[in-house]
Amino acid sequence: MMQSSLARPLPRPPIRPACGNPVCRSRPGSVSVARCRAEAAPPAPAPAARRAAGPYTGRDPEVKKPAWLRQRAAQGEKYARLRESIGELKLNTVCVEAQCPNIGECWNGGGGAGGEGDGIATATIMVLGDTCTRGCRFCAVKTSNKPPPPDPLEPLNTALAVASWGVDYVVLTSVDRDDLPDGGSSHFAQTVRALKELKPGILVECLTSDFRGDLEAVSALANSGLDVFAHNIETVRSLQRIVRDPRAGYDQSLAVLKHAKSCKEGMITKSSIMLGLGETDEEVKQAMIDLRAIGVDILTLGQYLQPTERHLTVREYVTPEKFQFWKEYGESVGFRYVASGPLVRSSYRAGELFVQNLVRNNKPKLPASS
């Protein structure tokens, strides 16, 4: 009797190789699967060529980051306490937003990122939100044409936080707010007044925008009770349009600093320059002379560090010895205080004792009562 075709055993389905190789006979779980996968894998694509440094941005493979720029990760009791307080009150700091390399040292009170220090802690609070209306090519702060409106509770929350820290010196800074009629000057001034009301003896430094050159806005802030008016020219004249947003400018910044100086007797003014962007020594000297010509008292100089490849290319890592040269040169042309070093930033240890004494001694003396 012929066997019915229905009774015949069905053919086995083909084994699907676990490795994906159609000629592989290894079953799932076989020890040879991994080897087979490696053998059958298509060749890895050639690595993409490094993007060549553009005229302004990108990484320059010829410029290597030196050892003197290495920093320990921030830690320490004071650092942890400040970070917690800032988070609870929903405050912004330029230390975090701008990826400052000195956050551990400053928040711990100078001396080191690990918590050892001299007790002079400096935290730079960023008011008017964390979103800037400008797009400077060196800056890591996020940007938008329409940032959220300022928090009306921010001046009070900032004052409460700073008063609870027990510090004697605080730096307030802000993003640029070209969307506001006065550039945020009145909000800035409210914060200063709230601080002075809660802690009358505190010294307040304000690192400001240029308020689009609005000198009335400069006056409103300069007369709010602050002790140091700081505004950065950022770089030498020839690099302004490359480094800064087109709405900023060298002469506009000088005008802001000059006007702030004239607003109040005893006003201390301050500015900062980044190095490593391709400036020449003669250009740096001229920038210092220009600042001294309008009476700027304090100058900081630091190394520009590129946040991402989309930001300006580092053209040079300036040596600590050259920074020492600039410190001595700055003092020789008349600055009352110069902080100069690879990791120095605008607010670097702003409240150290020398600066505190400079500010206090520069205040106009009240006439003696008869």
UniProtKB/Swiss-Prot annotation:
Chain residues that bind [4Fe-4S] cluster 2: C132, C136, C139
Family matches, as SMART domains: Elp3
Gene Ontology biological process terms from the UniProt entry: lipoate biosynthetic process
SUPFAM superfamilies in the record: Radical SAM enzymes
Cofactor: [4Fe-4S] cluster
Pfam families the record matches: Radical_SAM
Cofactor binding summary note: Binds 2 [4Fe-4S] clusters per subunit. One cluster is coordinated with 3 cysteines and an exchangeable S-adenosyl-L-methionine.
GO cellular component: chloroplast; mitochondrion
InterPro entries found in the cross-reference section: Aldolase_TIM (IPR013785), Elp3/MiaA/NifB-like_rSAM (IPR006638), Lipoyl_synth (IPR003698), Lipoyl_synth_chlpt (IPR027526), rSAM (IPR007197)
Annotated spans, Disordered: 1-25, 39-67
Domain of life: Eukaryota
Pathway(s) annotated for this protein in UniProt: Protein modification; protein lipoylation via endogenous pathway; protein N(6)-(lipoyl)lysine from octanoyl-[acyl-carrier-protein]: step 2/2
Domain Radical SAM core: 115-336
Record's catalysed reaction(s): [[Fe-S] cluster scaffold protein carrying a second [4Fe-4S](2+) cluster] + N(6)-octanoyl-L-lysyl-[protein] + 2 oxidized [2Fe-2S]-[ferredoxin] + 2 S-adenosyl-L-methionine + 4 H(+) = [[Fe-S] cluster scaffold protein] + N(6)-[(R)-dihydrolipoyl]-L-lysyl-[protein] + 4 Fe(3+) + 2 hydrogen sulfide + 2 5'-deoxyadenosine + 2 L-methionine + 2 reduced [2Fe-2S]-[ferredoxin]
Molecular-function GO terms, alphabetical: 4 iron, 4 sulfur cluster binding; lipoate synthase activity; metal ion binding
Protein family: Belongs to the radical SAM superfamily. Lipoyl synthase family.
Name of the protein: Lipoyl synthase 1, chloroplastic
Organism of derivation: Oryza sativa subsp. japonica
Lineage, uppermost ranks: Eukaryota, Viridiplantae, Streptophyta, Embryophyta, Tracheophyta
